Protein backbone atom coordinates (compact mmCIF):
# COMPACT_ATOMS: atom_id res chain seq x y z
CA UNK A 1 0.00 0.00 0.00
CA UNK A 2 1.28 3.48 -0.93
CA UNK A 3 1.92 5.73 2.06
CA UNK A 4 1.15 9.42 1.63
CA UNK A 5 3.84 11.58 3.20
CA UNK A 6 2.54 15.01 4.09
CA UNK A 7 6.02 16.65 4.16
CA UNK A 8 6.70 15.48 0.60
CA UNK A 9 3.40 16.90 -0.66
CA UNK A 10 3.97 20.22 1.11
CA UNK A 11 7.49 20.46 -0.43
CA UNK A 12 6.10 19.88 -3.92
CA UNK A 13 3.37 22.49 -3.39
CA UNK A 14 5.95 25.00 -2.05
CA UNK A 15 8.22 24.40 -5.09
CA UNK A 16 5.31 24.91 -7.48
CA UNK A 17 4.30 28.14 -5.74
CA UNK A 18 7.90 29.43 -5.87
CA UNK A 19 8.16 28.59 -9.58
CA UNK A 20 4.83 30.24 -10.42
CA UNK A 21 5.34 33.04 -12.93
CA UNK A 22 2.81 35.86 -12.55
CA UNK A 23 3.81 37.42 -15.87
CA UNK A 24 0.80 37.84 -18.17
CA UNK A 25 1.40 37.45 -21.93
CA UNK A 26 -0.97 38.74 -24.56
CA UNK A 27 -0.63 36.72 -27.75
CA UNK A 28 -2.38 37.73 -30.94
CA UNK A 29 -3.69 34.44 -32.37
CA UNK A 30 -5.89 33.27 -35.21
CA UNK A 31 -7.24 30.11 -36.83
CA UNK A 32 -6.46 28.66 -40.25
CA UNK A 33 -9.59 28.78 -42.45
CA UNK A 34 -8.01 27.52 -45.65
CA UNK A 35 -4.52 26.56 -46.86
CA UNK A 36 -3.05 25.59 -50.23
CA UNK A 37 -0.86 26.80 -53.13
CA UNK A 38 1.48 28.54 -50.69
CA UNK A 39 -1.34 30.75 -49.33
CA UNK A 40 -3.24 30.51 -46.03
CA UNK A 41 -6.41 32.38 -45.00
CA UNK A 42 -6.50 33.14 -41.29
CA UNK A 43 -9.49 34.16 -39.15
CA UNK A 44 -8.55 36.32 -36.16
CA UNK A 45 -5.10 37.96 -35.88
CA UNK A 46 -7.00 41.24 -35.34
CA UNK A 47 -3.95 43.38 -34.57
CA UNK A 48 -1.54 42.01 -37.19
CA UNK A 49 0.56 44.55 -39.16
CA UNK A 50 0.92 44.55 -42.94
CA UNK A 51 4.02 42.49 -43.77
CA UNK A 52 4.29 41.04 -40.23
CA UNK A 53 5.70 37.56 -39.72
CA UNK A 54 3.25 34.97 -38.37
CA UNK A 55 4.07 31.52 -36.99
CA UNK A 56 1.96 28.41 -37.52
CA UNK A 57 1.55 25.59 -34.98
CA UNK A 58 3.97 23.33 -36.87
CA UNK A 59 6.59 26.16 -36.96
CA UNK A 60 6.18 27.27 -40.62
CA UNK A 61 6.67 31.04 -40.94
CA UNK A 62 4.48 33.22 -43.16
CA UNK A 63 4.12 36.90 -44.10
CA UNK A 64 0.79 38.74 -43.91
CA UNK A 65 0.55 41.05 -46.97
CA UNK A 66 -3.28 41.03 -47.23
CA UNK A 67 -5.33 42.43 -44.33
CA UNK A 68 -9.01 42.03 -45.25
CA UNK A 69 -12.21 42.82 -43.32
CA UNK A 70 -12.91 39.27 -42.16
CA UNK A 71 -9.64 37.38 -42.69
CA UNK A 72 -5.89 37.77 -43.22
CA UNK A 73 -4.15 36.45 -46.36
CA UNK A 74 -0.75 34.93 -45.49
CA UNK A 75 1.97 33.77 -47.91
CA UNK A 76 3.99 30.81 -46.65
CA UNK A 77 7.79 30.66 -46.51
CA UNK A 78 7.83 26.91 -46.97
CA UNK A 79 5.67 24.18 -48.49
CA UNK A 80 3.13 24.26 -45.61
CA UNK A 81 2.21 20.59 -46.13
CA UNK A 82 1.76 19.99 -42.38
CA UNK A 83 -0.54 22.97 -41.79
CA UNK A 84 -4.11 21.87 -41.08
CA UNK A 85 -7.42 23.69 -41.28
CA UNK A 86 -8.43 24.85 -37.80
CA UNK A 87 -4.85 24.93 -36.43
CA UNK A 88 -3.74 28.05 -34.59
CA UNK A 89 -1.46 30.84 -35.82
CA UNK A 90 0.24 33.54 -33.75
CA UNK A 91 1.57 36.95 -34.75
CA UNK A 92 5.25 37.44 -33.91
CA UNK A 93 5.24 41.26 -33.75
CA UNK A 94 8.26 41.34 -36.12
CA UNK A 95 8.77 42.27 -39.77
CA UNK A 96 10.97 40.04 -41.98
CA UNK A 97 14.66 40.52 -41.14
CA UNK A 98 17.87 38.60 -41.68
CA UNK A 99 21.14 38.25 -39.75
CA UNK A 100 24.10 40.06 -41.37
CA UNK A 101 27.87 39.86 -40.84
CA UNK A 102 31.26 39.57 -42.58
CA UNK A 103 30.99 35.78 -42.10
CA UNK A 104 28.54 35.60 -45.04
CA UNK A 105 31.39 36.25 -47.52
CA UNK A 106 32.15 33.12 -49.53
CA UNK A 107 28.86 31.43 -48.65
CA UNK A 108 25.77 30.31 -50.59
CA UNK A 109 22.54 31.13 -48.75
CA UNK A 110 18.79 31.16 -49.35
CA UNK A 111 16.31 34.06 -49.09
CA UNK A 112 16.11 33.65 -45.29
CA UNK A 113 19.94 33.96 -45.05
CA UNK A 114 20.26 30.28 -44.07
CA UNK A 115 23.34 28.52 -45.53
CA UNK A 116 22.63 25.95 -48.28
CA UNK A 117 26.25 25.05 -49.12
CA UNK A 118 26.62 22.39 -46.41
CA UNK A 119 29.42 24.26 -44.63
CA UNK A 120 27.71 24.79 -41.27
CA UNK A 121 26.00 27.72 -39.61
CA UNK A 122 27.02 31.36 -40.12
CA UNK A 123 27.68 33.39 -36.98
CA UNK A 124 26.28 36.92 -36.77
CA UNK A 125 25.41 39.38 -34.02
CA UNK A 126 23.46 41.93 -36.08
CA UNK A 127 20.34 41.86 -38.20
CA UNK A 128 18.81 44.08 -40.90
CA UNK A 129 15.25 44.42 -42.15
CA UNK A 130 14.83 42.69 -45.52
CA UNK A 131 12.93 45.74 -46.77
CA UNK A 132 14.43 49.02 -45.63
CA UNK A 133 13.90 52.50 -47.11
CA UNK A 134 16.21 53.63 -49.91
CA UNK A 135 18.69 56.46 -49.14
CA UNK A 136 17.20 59.94 -49.59
CA UNK A 137 18.51 62.72 -51.83
CA UNK A 138 20.71 64.26 -49.10
CA UNK A 139 22.24 60.84 -48.30
CA UNK A 140 23.50 60.42 -51.89
CA UNK A 141 26.10 61.99 -54.11
CA UNK A 142 26.49 61.79 -57.87
CA UNK A 143 28.30 58.80 -59.36
CA UNK A 144 31.90 59.64 -60.23
CA UNK A 145 34.08 56.55 -59.64
CA UNK A 146 34.32 53.86 -62.34
CA UNK A 147 33.33 50.27 -61.65
CA UNK A 148 35.46 48.35 -64.14
CA UNK A 149 33.72 45.32 -65.67
CA UNK A 150 36.82 44.08 -67.51
CA UNK A 151 34.84 44.04 -70.78
CA UNK A 152 36.20 46.49 -73.38
CA UNK A 153 32.81 47.15 -75.01
CA UNK A 154 31.28 48.23 -71.69
CA UNK A 155 34.18 50.08 -70.04
CA UNK A 156 34.95 52.11 -73.16
CA UNK A 157 31.48 52.92 -74.50
CA UNK A 158 28.85 52.14 -71.83
CA UNK A 159 30.79 52.92 -68.62
CA UNK A 160 29.34 51.90 -65.25
CA UNK A 161 30.06 53.91 -62.10
CA UNK A 162 29.97 52.88 -58.45
CA UNK A 163 26.43 53.47 -57.21
CA UNK A 164 24.82 53.20 -60.65
CA UNK A 165 21.95 50.89 -61.70
CA UNK A 166 22.64 49.43 -65.16
CA UNK A 167 20.24 46.94 -66.75
CA UNK A 168 21.55 43.95 -68.71
CA UNK A 169 18.81 42.94 -71.15
CA UNK A 170 18.53 40.40 -73.95
CA UNK A 171 16.97 37.15 -75.14
CA UNK A 172 17.71 33.81 -73.50
CA UNK A 173 21.16 32.34 -74.22
CA UNK A 174 22.79 35.61 -75.28
CA UNK A 175 25.39 35.74 -72.48
CA UNK A 176 23.66 38.03 -69.93
CA UNK A 177 24.80 36.04 -66.89
CA UNK A 178 28.31 35.77 -68.41
CA UNK A 179 28.59 39.59 -68.55
CA UNK A 180 27.51 39.83 -64.90
CA UNK A 181 29.80 37.04 -63.65
CA UNK A 182 32.79 38.45 -65.58
CA UNK A 183 32.14 41.78 -63.83
CA UNK A 184 32.31 39.98 -60.46
CA UNK A 185 35.57 38.22 -61.49
CA UNK A 186 37.06 41.60 -62.42
CA UNK A 187 36.47 42.96 -58.89
CA UNK A 188 39.29 40.77 -57.52
CA UNK A 189 41.69 43.02 -55.62
CA UNK A 190 39.43 46.07 -56.12
CA UNK A 191 38.01 45.98 -52.56
CA UNK A 192 34.44 45.48 -53.82
CA UNK A 193 32.02 43.09 -52.07
CA UNK A 194 29.83 41.23 -54.60
CA UNK A 195 26.37 39.73 -54.07
CA UNK A 196 24.95 37.44 -56.76
CA UNK A 197 21.20 36.81 -56.42
CA UNK A 198 19.80 33.89 -58.46
CA UNK A 199 15.99 34.04 -58.67
CA UNK A 200 14.08 31.12 -60.16
CA UNK A 201 17.15 29.75 -61.98
CA UNK A 202 17.92 26.07 -62.56
CA UNK A 203 19.96 24.64 -59.68
CA UNK A 204 22.54 23.40 -62.24
CA UNK A 205 23.02 26.97 -63.60
CA UNK A 206 23.59 28.34 -60.09
CA UNK A 207 26.05 25.51 -59.31
CA UNK A 208 27.94 26.35 -62.52
CA UNK A 209 28.23 30.03 -61.52
CA UNK A 210 29.41 29.12 -58.00
CA UNK A 211 32.01 26.70 -59.46
CA UNK A 212 33.32 29.47 -61.76
CA UNK A 213 33.66 31.82 -58.76
CA UNK A 214 35.49 29.16 -56.74
CA UNK A 215 37.89 28.30 -59.58
CA UNK A 216 38.73 31.97 -60.20
CA UNK A 217 39.09 32.81 -56.48
CA UNK A 218 36.10 35.16 -56.50
CA UNK A 219 34.12 33.50 -53.69
CA UNK A 220 36.28 35.14 -51.00
CA UNK A 221 34.59 38.51 -51.69
CA UNK A 222 31.21 37.20 -52.96
CA UNK A 223 27.92 36.11 -51.37
CA UNK A 224 25.51 34.00 -53.46
CA UNK A 225 21.79 34.21 -52.60
CA UNK A 226 19.93 31.43 -54.42
CA UNK A 227 16.25 30.54 -54.67
CA UNK A 228 15.91 28.04 -57.50
CA UNK A 229 12.90 27.37 -59.74
CA UNK A 230 11.46 24.79 -57.30
CA UNK A 231 11.44 27.23 -54.34
CA UNK A 232 8.13 28.63 -53.02
CA UNK A 233 7.04 31.85 -54.78
CA UNK A 234 7.36 33.79 -51.49
CA UNK A 235 11.07 33.00 -51.22
CA UNK A 236 11.71 33.84 -54.89
CA UNK A 237 9.99 37.17 -54.24
CA UNK A 238 12.10 37.85 -51.11
CA UNK A 239 15.53 36.78 -52.45
CA UNK A 240 16.46 40.13 -54.15
CA UNK A 241 15.57 42.08 -50.99
CA UNK A 242 17.75 39.70 -48.93
CA UNK A 243 20.65 40.35 -51.32
CA UNK A 244 20.06 44.11 -51.09
CA UNK A 245 20.01 43.97 -47.26
CA UNK A 246 23.39 42.17 -47.23
CA UNK A 247 24.88 44.67 -49.71
CA UNK A 248 23.51 47.58 -47.62
CA UNK A 249 25.21 46.20 -44.52
CA UNK A 250 28.59 46.65 -46.25
CA UNK A 251 27.61 49.92 -47.99
CA UNK A 252 26.82 51.61 -44.67
CA UNK A 253 30.21 50.42 -43.41
CA UNK A 254 31.88 52.61 -46.05
CA UNK A 255 32.56 49.69 -48.41
CA UNK A 256 31.85 49.36 -52.14
CA UNK A 257 29.39 46.66 -53.17
CA UNK A 258 28.11 45.20 -56.44
CA UNK A 259 24.79 43.32 -56.58
CA UNK A 260 23.61 41.22 -59.52
CA UNK A 261 19.88 40.39 -59.71
CA UNK A 262 19.44 37.40 -62.05
CA UNK A 263 16.68 38.04 -62.85
CA UNK A 264 13.89 40.41 -61.65
CA UNK A 265 11.41 39.17 -64.30
CA UNK A 266 11.33 35.81 -62.44
CA UNK A 267 10.71 37.75 -59.20
CA UNK A 268 7.81 39.56 -60.90
CA UNK A 269 6.36 36.20 -61.99
CA UNK A 270 6.59 34.87 -58.41
CA UNK A 271 4.93 38.06 -57.15
CA UNK A 272 2.18 37.72 -59.80
CA UNK A 273 1.53 34.16 -58.62
CA UNK A 274 1.28 35.29 -54.98
CA UNK A 275 -0.97 38.25 -55.84
CA UNK A 276 -3.39 36.24 -57.98
CA UNK A 277 -3.70 33.57 -55.28
CA UNK A 278 -4.37 36.33 -52.73
CA UNK A 279 -7.15 37.50 -55.11
CA UNK A 280 -5.62 40.91 -55.79
CA UNK A 281 -6.99 42.46 -59.00
CA UNK A 282 -4.78 41.69 -62.05
CA UNK A 283 -3.54 44.41 -64.40
CA UNK A 284 -1.48 44.36 -67.61
CA UNK A 285 -0.18 40.85 -68.47
CA UNK A 286 -2.01 39.71 -65.26
CA UNK A 287 0.65 41.40 -63.09
CA UNK A 288 -0.68 43.25 -60.01
CA UNK A 289 -0.89 47.05 -60.05
CA UNK A 290 2.16 47.53 -57.81
CA UNK A 291 4.66 45.50 -59.85
CA UNK A 292 6.53 48.72 -60.77
CA UNK A 293 6.91 49.48 -57.04
CA UNK A 294 8.18 45.91 -56.53
CA UNK A 295 11.27 46.72 -58.64
CA UNK A 296 11.64 50.44 -57.94
CA UNK A 297 11.91 49.97 -54.17
CA UNK A 298 14.54 47.29 -54.77
CA UNK A 299 16.71 49.17 -57.28
CA UNK A 300 16.44 52.56 -55.54
CA UNK A 301 18.41 51.03 -52.66
CA UNK A 302 21.49 51.09 -54.91
CA UNK A 303 23.28 54.38 -54.30
CA UNK A 304 26.55 56.23 -53.91
CA UNK A 305 26.60 57.45 -50.29
CA UNK A 306 27.42 61.06 -49.45
CA UNK A 307 30.72 62.08 -47.83
CA UNK A 308 28.96 62.35 -44.45
CA UNK A 309 27.94 58.68 -44.67
CA UNK A 310 31.42 57.52 -45.69
CA UNK A 311 31.08 57.32 -49.50
CA UNK A 312 30.19 53.62 -49.61
CA UNK A 313 28.29 52.43 -52.67
CA UNK A 314 25.94 49.77 -53.98
CA UNK A 315 26.01 49.20 -57.74
CA UNK A 316 23.10 47.15 -59.11
CA UNK A 317 23.14 45.14 -62.33
CA UNK A 318 19.65 43.67 -62.83
CA UNK A 319 19.33 41.14 -65.66
CA UNK A 320 16.04 40.94 -67.61
CA UNK A 321 15.21 38.31 -70.22
CA UNK A 322 13.21 39.40 -73.27
CA UNK A 323 11.08 37.27 -75.59
CA UNK A 324 12.44 37.47 -79.17
CA UNK A 325 13.98 40.90 -78.64
CA UNK A 326 10.77 42.59 -77.43
CA UNK A 327 12.04 45.30 -75.07
CA UNK A 328 8.64 47.03 -75.06
CA UNK A 329 7.04 44.32 -72.90
CA UNK A 330 5.78 45.29 -69.43
CA UNK A 331 8.64 44.23 -67.13
CA UNK A 332 11.51 45.29 -69.47
CA UNK A 333 10.04 48.80 -69.92
CA UNK A 334 9.48 49.11 -66.17
CA UNK A 335 13.07 48.20 -65.32
CA UNK A 336 14.50 50.34 -68.17
CA UNK A 337 12.67 53.36 -66.72
CA UNK A 338 14.05 52.70 -63.21
CA UNK A 339 17.70 52.09 -64.13
CA UNK A 340 20.45 54.54 -65.22
CA UNK A 341 21.00 52.90 -68.60
CA UNK A 342 20.94 49.50 -70.24
CA UNK A 343 23.23 47.06 -72.01
CA UNK A 344 21.43 45.28 -74.87
CA UNK A 345 22.63 41.82 -75.82
CA UNK A 346 21.63 40.71 -79.29
CA UNK A 347 20.96 37.12 -80.36
CA UNK A 348 22.00 37.99 -83.95
CA UNK A 349 25.42 39.26 -82.80
CA UNK A 350 25.82 36.24 -80.52
CA UNK A 351 25.10 33.85 -83.41
CA UNK A 352 27.49 35.82 -85.64
CA UNK A 353 30.31 35.02 -83.18
CA UNK A 354 30.55 38.51 -81.66
CA UNK A 355 30.83 37.79 -77.94
CA UNK A 356 30.05 39.50 -75.63
CA UNK A 357 27.08 40.16 -77.96
CA UNK A 358 26.64 43.79 -76.89
CA UNK A 359 24.71 45.99 -79.30
CA UNK A 360 26.72 49.17 -78.74
CA UNK A 361 24.39 51.28 -80.89
CA UNK A 362 21.31 50.99 -78.65
CA UNK A 363 23.06 50.41 -75.31
CA UNK A 364 23.47 53.50 -73.15
CA UNK A 365 24.85 54.59 -69.78
CA UNK A 366 23.18 57.69 -68.37
CA UNK A 367 26.19 58.37 -66.15
CA UNK A 368 28.48 58.53 -69.18
CA UNK A 369 32.12 59.56 -69.07
CA UNK A 370 31.83 60.67 -65.41
CA UNK A 371 32.39 56.98 -64.66
CA UNK A 372 35.60 56.65 -66.71
CA UNK A 373 39.22 57.33 -65.89
CA UNK A 374 40.75 60.15 -67.95
CA UNK A 375 42.97 57.75 -69.93
CA UNK A 376 39.90 55.84 -71.15
CA UNK A 377 38.08 59.06 -72.09
CA UNK A 378 41.12 60.14 -74.13
CA UNK A 379 41.40 56.96 -76.21
CA UNK A 380 37.75 55.83 -76.43
CA UNK A 381 36.06 59.18 -76.99
CA UNK A 382 35.08 58.62 -80.63
CA UNK A 383 34.79 54.80 -80.63
CA UNK A 384 31.01 54.65 -80.19
CA UNK A 385 30.39 57.13 -83.01
CA UNK A 386 32.84 55.33 -85.31
CA UNK A 387 31.18 51.97 -84.67
CA UNK A 388 27.71 53.43 -85.28
CA UNK A 389 28.89 54.96 -88.59
CA UNK A 390 30.51 51.64 -89.52
CA UNK A 391 27.26 49.70 -88.87
CA UNK A 392 25.36 52.17 -91.09
CA UNK A 393 28.01 51.99 -93.81
CA UNK A 394 28.11 48.19 -93.66
CA UNK A 395 24.35 47.99 -94.24
CA UNK A 396 24.67 50.40 -97.18
CA UNK A 397 27.72 48.59 -98.63
CA UNK A 398 25.71 45.39 -99.10
CA UNK A 399 23.81 47.09 -101.95
CA UNK A 400 26.71 49.00 -103.51
CA UNK A 401 28.98 47.22 -106.00
CA UNK A 402 31.93 49.60 -106.36
CA UNK A 403 33.05 51.51 -103.27
CA UNK A 404 35.62 54.30 -103.26
CA UNK A 405 38.92 53.87 -101.42
CA UNK A 406 37.92 56.02 -98.40
CA UNK A 407 34.76 53.96 -97.83
CA UNK A 408 36.71 50.70 -98.13
CA UNK A 409 39.22 51.98 -95.56
CA UNK A 410 36.43 53.02 -93.19
CA UNK A 411 34.81 49.58 -93.51
CA UNK A 412 38.16 47.85 -92.87
CA UNK A 413 38.78 50.03 -89.78
CA UNK A 414 35.27 49.31 -88.47
CA UNK A 415 35.67 45.56 -88.89
CA UNK A 416 38.90 45.65 -86.89
CA UNK A 417 37.33 47.84 -84.18
CA UNK A 418 34.49 45.34 -83.86
CA UNK A 419 37.02 42.51 -83.70
CA UNK A 420 38.94 44.04 -80.79
CA UNK A 421 35.71 44.19 -78.73
CA UNK A 422 35.48 40.38 -78.76
CA UNK A 423 36.53 38.67 -75.53
CA UNK A 424 36.54 35.15 -74.15
CA UNK A 425 34.37 34.36 -71.14
CA UNK A 426 36.00 34.62 -67.69
CA UNK A 427 38.91 36.63 -69.14
CA UNK A 428 38.32 40.25 -68.03
CA UNK A 429 40.98 42.83 -68.93
CA UNK A 430 42.52 45.45 -66.64
CA UNK A 431 41.78 49.05 -67.64
CA UNK A 432 45.43 49.64 -68.68
CA UNK A 433 45.20 46.72 -71.12
CA UNK A 434 41.90 48.05 -72.46
CA UNK A 435 43.52 51.43 -73.16
CA UNK A 436 46.25 49.64 -75.17
CA UNK A 437 43.67 47.64 -77.15
CA UNK A 438 41.45 50.60 -78.06
CA UNK A 439 44.33 52.96 -78.90
CA UNK A 440 45.82 50.34 -81.24
CA UNK A 441 42.55 49.87 -83.13
CA UNK A 442 41.33 53.49 -83.18
CA UNK A 443 44.62 54.82 -84.58
CA UNK A 444 44.76 52.41 -87.50
CA UNK A 445 47.65 50.23 -86.31
CA UNK A 446 45.56 47.10 -86.95
CA UNK A 447 44.79 48.04 -90.58
CA UNK A 448 47.75 46.05 -92.10
CA UNK A 449 46.55 42.86 -90.35
CA UNK A 450 43.96 40.37 -91.56
CA UNK A 451 40.80 40.32 -89.41
CA UNK A 452 41.63 36.80 -88.19
CA UNK A 453 45.05 37.99 -86.94
CA UNK A 454 43.76 40.88 -84.77
CA UNK A 455 43.06 38.90 -81.59
CA UNK A 456 46.37 37.01 -81.72
CA UNK A 457 48.35 40.24 -82.25
CA UNK A 458 46.60 42.08 -79.38
CA UNK A 459 47.34 39.21 -76.96
CA UNK A 460 51.01 39.33 -78.03
CA UNK A 461 51.16 43.14 -77.66
CA UNK A 462 49.60 43.13 -74.17
CA UNK A 463 51.99 40.38 -73.01
CA UNK A 464 54.99 42.30 -74.40
CA UNK A 465 53.97 45.53 -72.62
CA UNK A 466 53.37 43.69 -69.35
CA UNK A 467 56.79 42.02 -69.36
CA UNK A 468 59.06 44.48 -71.22
CA UNK A 469 57.46 47.89 -70.60
CA UNK A 470 55.98 47.79 -67.07
CA UNK A 471 56.43 51.59 -66.81
CA UNK A 472 53.44 52.03 -69.20
CA UNK A 473 51.08 50.32 -66.76
CA UNK A 474 52.60 52.27 -63.85
CA UNK A 475 51.98 55.63 -65.58
CA UNK A 476 48.31 54.81 -66.34
CA UNK A 477 47.56 53.37 -62.88
CA UNK A 478 49.28 56.20 -60.97
CA UNK A 479 48.17 59.23 -63.04
CA UNK A 480 44.97 57.65 -64.50
CA UNK A 481 45.85 59.71 -67.59
CA UNK A 482 47.15 58.76 -71.03
CA UNK A 483 50.21 61.02 -70.89
CA UNK A 484 52.54 61.88 -73.79
CA UNK A 485 55.18 59.63 -72.22
CA UNK A 486 52.72 56.71 -72.08
CA UNK A 487 51.72 57.33 -75.70
CA UNK A 488 55.38 57.35 -76.82
CA UNK A 489 56.06 54.03 -75.02
CA UNK A 490 52.93 52.49 -76.55
CA UNK A 491 53.67 53.71 -80.10
CA UNK A 492 57.18 52.30 -79.92
CA UNK A 493 55.91 48.95 -78.60
CA UNK A 494 53.21 48.71 -81.30
CA UNK A 495 55.66 49.43 -84.14
CA UNK A 496 58.17 46.88 -82.82
CA UNK A 497 55.53 44.22 -82.31
CA UNK A 498 53.65 44.73 -85.58
CA UNK A 499 56.85 44.31 -87.62
CA UNK A 500 57.79 41.22 -85.63
CA UNK A 501 54.26 39.80 -85.90
CA UNK A 502 53.99 40.31 -89.68
CA UNK A 503 57.44 38.74 -90.13
CA UNK A 504 56.43 35.72 -88.00
CA UNK A 505 53.16 35.29 -89.94
CA UNK A 506 54.98 35.34 -93.31
CA UNK A 507 57.57 32.73 -92.32
From Swiss-Prot:
Superkingdom of source? Eukaryota
Q: Can you quote a single GO CC term? A: chloroplast thylakoid membrane
Q: Where in the cell is it found?
A: Plastid, Chloroplast thylakoid membrane
| Enzyme Commission number(s) | 7.1.2.2
Spell out the InterPro entries in the cross-references.
ATP_synth_asu-like_sf (IPR023366), ATP_synth_asu_C (IPR000793), ATP_synth_asu_C_sf (IPR038376), ATP_synth_F1_a_nt-bd_dom (IPR033732), ATP_synth_F1_asu (IPR005294), ATPase_a/bsu_AS (IPR020003), ATPase_F1/V1/A1_a/bsu_N (IPR004100), ATPase_F1/V1/A1_a/bsu_N_sf (IPR036121)
Gene3D superfamilies for the chain: 2.40.30.20, ATP synthase alpha/beta chain, C-terminal domain, P-loop containing nucleotide triphosphate hydrolases
Keywords attached to this Swiss-Prot or TrEMBL record, sorted alphabetically, are: ATP synthesis, ATP-binding, CF(1), Chloroplast, Hydrogen ion transport, Ion transport, Membrane, Nucleotide-binding, Plastid, Thylakoid, Translocase, Transport
Specify which residues bind ATP according to the UniProt entry for this protein: 170-177
GO terms for biological process, alphabetical? proton motive force-driven ATP synthesis
> Would I find Secreted among this entry's keywords?
no
- The UniProt site entry described as Required for activity is assigned to 363
Q: Does the keyword Lipoprotein apply?
A: no
**How is this protein positioned relative to the membrane?**
Peripheral membrane protein
Reaction(s) catalysed (UniProt annotation): ATP + H2O + 4 H(+)(in) = ADP + phosphate + 5 H(+)(out)
The cysteines joined by S-S bonds are none
Q: Which PROSITE patterns match?
A: ATPASE_ALPHA_BETA
Q: How does it assemble?
A: F-type ATPases have 2 components, CF(1) - the catalytic core - and CF(0) - the membrane proton channel. CF(1) has five subunits: alpha(3), beta(3), gamma(1), delta(1), epsilon(1). CF(0) has four main subunits: a, b, b' and c.
Role, per record: Produces ATP from ADP in the presence of a proton gradient across the membrane. The alpha chain is a regulatory subunit.
Q: Which HAMAP family match?
A: ATP_synth_alpha_bact (MF_01346)
Q: Can you say what this protein is called?
A: ATP synthase subunit alpha, chloroplastic
Taxonomic lineage from the root: Eukaryota, Viridiplantae, Streptophyta, Embryophyta, Tracheophyta
Name the gene for this chain: atpA
